[in-house]
Amino acid sequence: MKMPIIKKLVETASFEELENAELSILEEQQPDIEVEGDDEGEQLTHVMAAIWIKKEMEKEGIPFPKALRAYTQKVRVSIGG
């Protein structure tokens, strides 16, 4: 998971573009938007993170850095760290 890639997706892609990219990657297709990553798993992680962060920013009315922190804390908890 690379934060600069997630930030770029949050800033440049719409919800619809991100959701379509997620679907494309899951179906082993090339997404319509550029999604950087070493493999499809990392690309999917970046897209899913960007979707979660955009939703959090909208729901809570918070800036990207705060939403990113909330996301990384959520990930740490889910992996037991």
Where are these regions (language model features)?
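C-terminal alpha-helical interaction appendages
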Residues: 1-81
